[in-house]
Amino acid sequence: MARALADLSVNLQVPRVVPSPDSDSDTDLEDPSPRRSAGGLHRSQVIHSGHFMVSSPHSDSLTRRRDQEGPVGLADFGPRSIDPTLTRLFECLSLAYSGKLVSPKWKNFKGLKLLCRDKIRLNNAIWRAWYIQYVQRRKSPVCGFVTPLQGSEADEHRKPEAVVLEGNYWKRRIEVVMREYHKWRIYYKKRLRKSSREGDFLAPKQVEGGWPPPERWCEQLFSSVVPVLLGGSEEEPGGRQLLDLDCFLSDISDTLFTMTQPSPSSLQLPSEDAYVGNADMIQPDLTPLQPSLDDFMEISDFFTNYRPPQTPTSSNFPEPPSFGPMADSLFSGGILGPEMPSPASASSSSGMTPLSGNTRLQARNSCSGPLDPSTFPSSEFLLPEDPKTKMPPAPVPTPLLPYPGPVKVHGLEPCTPSPFPTMAPPPALLSEEPLFSARFPFTTVPPAPGVSTLPAPTTFVPTPQPGPGPGPVPFPVDHLPHGYLEPVFGPHFTVPQGVQPRCKPCSPPPGGRKASPPTLTSATASPTATATARDNNPCLTQLLRAAKPEQVLEPSTVPSTLLRPPESPDAVPEIPRVRAFYPPIPAPTPPRPPPGPATLAPPRSLVVPKAERLSPPASSGSERRPSGDLNSIQPPGALSVHLSPPQTVLSRGRVDNNKMENRRITHISAEQKRRFNIKLGFDTLHGLVSTLSAQPSLKVSKATTLQKTAEYILMLQQERAAMQEEAQQLRDEIEELNAAINLCQQQLPATGVPITHQRFDQMRDMFDDYVRTRTLHNWKFWVFSILIRPLFESFNGMVSTASLHSLRQTSLAWLDQYCSLPALRPTVLNSLRQLSTSTSILTDPSLVPEQATRAVTEGPLGRPL
């Protein structure tokens, strides 16, 4: 049964139909005042309001309307007039309903805060609507009822299910929402009482002499909002008993919905509002639609997609156009940028130890030709040299960070420079700056006792060689402490080797600052790195050479190990390893000037995050043999750190690679699904075709299966055609039989069972005998027989006595056809004409009795004598 919804009008004071001592009292006799006794006779005779009556329907906390109507005069004691319509009810209430009503039984209107008298009026209105519809057979203007017995009304009897849209259009049933709302209200009431005991700002204000009793301030708090629930001091005694709290005070053991909802912001709860947490004084807002912090905590590729704003540098050198949009790398302006604070402040804020220049790192460029120092970043990525240390002269700083050219260790084939014009070398290096920015704080872990730090950087003999041909260059990342834990995200990348042309050695240009940028290299072993490790060289240089424009990114399965000298007995402390995401460099790459030595020496052990290594697969023999020109200088306490600049191009390359991988996986899955469907179809054919299912163990080829299936389908089509032809023949025979039956039925009389002529004559003889007998007693019956004979003959020919049902139907049809006045008038007129012509009733009426007796004894009845 659908639930009727009632909405009280704003003004319940309606004009009285007739002046009355109590205009709104339909069934109320609670006040035995003298002014009510006058209308007692009228009130006791008629039940005014309807079907449902109670003794005290007005025991509510609201003010009675009769107290607001003013004094009662003598004119108010007139007789009451009952309004049989629902007009007066509509003046008091506005009634709406949804669905269909079935019965007029009492309805509690659960979920609606209605006064008892309003519930009585609504139920009486529904009862009167039922009475109007089913008893008075009139259409009710209020609501309609259905009887769920048969037909389409059975579907209309179903309970309507409402849904509520929450959040991002999430549908839930209205019952669940109502239940949750009730629990929410009770939950906040309990929380309010708990907060009041603790004395927070949500509790009501204190009164003199301490806190008032809880029921008293709760009554003051909620009496204006829920007057029926708590009421006031003026509430009548029977008021609380009339309220049904079953729906409101429901079970609140499950507070899942209320506990998981995000709490409103502190800005929405001003401290001066003492009752802002009260559920009766606030309404649900749009807080569930606000973004939640949990939505951002499950983004695994947060750092890969992070692109900080580009930091302006002090370099005035132009960059190649191909590297213009890629200058906003992860560490741009943040690792060794000009805006960095002092080393002491940076190390204290970021937890890093700035590298001091105590040890030189000499590297050599393997490519020669027109070198363009301006294509490399300014000295913000380069550590300053120690003026106290004497190193071989190198003309230009080593540009390993932003646009690294191909670097080759002695004995290995070099890479080729890009044909960019040579420009002036960069100015002097900046002052000493910390290695990492405070944007990425790393913790400095002091070395444990008995644990030695990494050795000093290795000095490489410069042997620059020219070589044409651009290509993408991977960023080498080596030499991190052993045991850095790799996070699950961020795969290893392997760069395919490219064509390595022969290059002629060239001499480096004279003059220039001697500095080498730090290069972080991972500890994943490659053949060259393994050979270097055998020669006791802890600092490894990754091969940078020309390759294809696309870089194939392969997950590395080699575990990361620390490449340190075999004779080093000390272990490196196990520190969690952080993987850095470095993007690939698209072709072409700018040339590199010959590197110069730089000094990298921290005062204590430096915790460096584990960086991603892009290791090219070593396949040539020259790459497998160790580099013989690698000489190491390993002072204790020195850490060789090589920084390779991150570029955001890797994320784009990895996105493209992920798209290709996803496309490949999708293609493979689609192909597998297609083949599985084909196999499933052939298995189904084996089960359907009788010639194949008869021999399940016999392996049949797909061509044979298709041929047998085609033959089987042809046979089924022939059988179906034969069956359709047979069915058509049967339909034709059925039509012929129906036509014959209809022809026979048309020959039957329309009045029912035919009466034989013999039976008709027998009935006429019985009628004549009866007329003769009755005429001998009274001659007037003969006159009556003349009038009734045509009706008797029509009755004898039309009425059937096969069954009581047919007798009833034929008798009613005979009455309608022959006994109506239009049919009786000509029949009686003909009978009177016959009587006038056959007797002397018009000339000598005294002779009529004798003529009647002679007619029944001598001549045929009804015939003229």
UniProtKB/Swiss-Prot annotation:
<feature type="modified residue" description="Phosphoserine">
    <location>
        <position position="20"/>
    </location>
</feature>
<keyword id="KW-0597">Phosphoprotein</keyword>
<feature type="modified residue" description="Phosphoserine">
    <location>
        <position position="25"/>
    </location>
</feature>
<feature type="domain" description="bHLH">
    <location>
        <begin position="662"/>
        <end position="716"/>
    </location>
</feature>
<dbReference type="GO" id="GO:0003700">
    <property type="term" value="F:DNA-binding transcription factor activity"/>
</dbReference>
<dbReference type="GO" id="GO:0045892">
    <property type="term" value="P:negative regulation of DNA-templated transcription"/>
</dbReference>
<dbReference type="GO" id="GO:0046982">
    <property type="term" value="F:protein heterodimerization activity"/>
</dbReference>
<feature type="modified residue" description="Phosphothreonine">
    <location>
        <position position="27"/>
    </location>
</feature>
<dbReference type="GO" id="GO:0031667">
    <property type="term" value="P:response to nutrient levels"/>
</dbReference>
<dbReference type="GO" id="GO:0005737">
    <property type="term" value="C:cytoplasm"/>
</dbReference>
<dbReference type="GO" id="GO:0045893">
    <property type="term" value="P:positive regulation of DNA-templated transcription"/>
</dbReference>
<dbReference type="GO" id="GO:0045944">
    <property type="term" value="P:positive regulation of transcription by RNA polymerase II"/>
</dbReference>
<dbReference type="GO" id="GO:0035538">
    <property type="term" value="F:carbohydrate response element binding"/>
</dbReference>
<feature type="compositionally biased region" description="Pro residues">
    <location>
        <begin position="583"/>
        <end position="597"/>
    </location>
</feature>
<dbReference type="GO" id="GO:0008610">
    <property type="term" value="P:lipid biosynthetic process"/>
</dbReference>
<dbReference type="GO" id="GO:0005634">
    <property type="term" value="C:nucleus"/>
</dbReference>
<dbReference type="GO" id="GO:0000981">
    <property type="term" value="F:DNA-binding transcription factor activity, RNA polymerase II-specific"/>
</dbReference>
<dbReference type="GO" id="GO:0019901">
    <property type="term" value="F:protein kinase binding"/>
</dbReference>
<feature type="modified residue" description="Phosphoserine">
    <location>
        <position position="627"/>
    </location>
</feature>
<dbReference type="GO" id="GO:0005667">
    <property type="term" value="C:transcription regulator complex"/>
</dbReference>
<feature type="region of interest" description="Disordered">
    <location>
        <begin position="500"/>
        <end position="653"/>
    </location>
</feature>
<feature type="region of interest" description="Disordered">
    <location>
        <begin position="53"/>
        <end position="77"/>
    </location>
</feature>
<feature type="modified residue" description="Phosphoserine">
    <location>
        <position position="23"/>
    </location>
</feature>
<dbReference type="GO" id="GO:0009749">
    <property type="term" value="P:response to glucose"/>
</dbReference>
<dbReference type="GO" id="GO:0033552">
    <property type="term" value="P:response to vitamin B3"/>
</dbReference>
<dbReference type="GO" id="GO:0140297">
    <property type="term" value="F:DNA-binding transcription factor binding"/>
</dbReference>
<keyword id="KW-0678">Repressor</keyword>
<dbReference type="GO" id="GO:1901797">
    <property type="term" value="P:negative regulation of signal transduction by p53 class mediator"/>
</dbReference>
<dbReference type="GO" id="GO:0001216">
    <property type="term" value="F:DNA-binding transcription activator activity"/>
</dbReference>
<protein>
    <recommendedName>
        <fullName>Carbohydrate-responsive element-binding protein</fullName>
    </recommendedName>
</protein>
<dbReference type="GO" id="GO:0000432">
    <property type="term" value="P:positive regulation of transcription from RNA polymerase II promoter by glucose"/>
</dbReference>
<dbReference type="GO" id="GO:0000785">
    <property type="term" value="C:chromatin"/>
</dbReference>
<keyword id="KW-0238">DNA-binding</keyword>
<dbReference type="GO" id="GO:0045723">
    <property type="term" value="P:positive regulation of fatty acid biosynthetic process"/>
</dbReference>
<dbReference type="GO" id="GO:0010255">
    <property type="term" value="P:glucose mediated signaling pathway"/>
</dbReference>
<dbReference type="GO" id="GO:0042593">
    <property type="term" value="P:glucose homeostasis"/>
</dbReference>
<dbReference type="InterPro" id="IPR011598">
    <property type="entry name" value="bHLH_dom"/>
</dbReference>
<feature type="region of interest" description="Leucine-zipper">
    <location>
        <begin position="716"/>
        <end position="737"/>
    </location>
</feature>
<feature type="modified residue" description="Phosphoserine">
    <location>
        <position position="615"/>
    </location>
</feature>
<dbReference type="GO" id="GO:0001227">
    <property type="term" value="F:DNA-binding transcription repressor activity, RNA polymerase II-specific"/>
</dbReference>
<feature type="compositionally biased region" description="Low complexity">
    <location>
        <begin position="515"/>
        <end position="533"/>
    </location>
</feature>
<keyword id="KW-0804">Transcription</keyword>
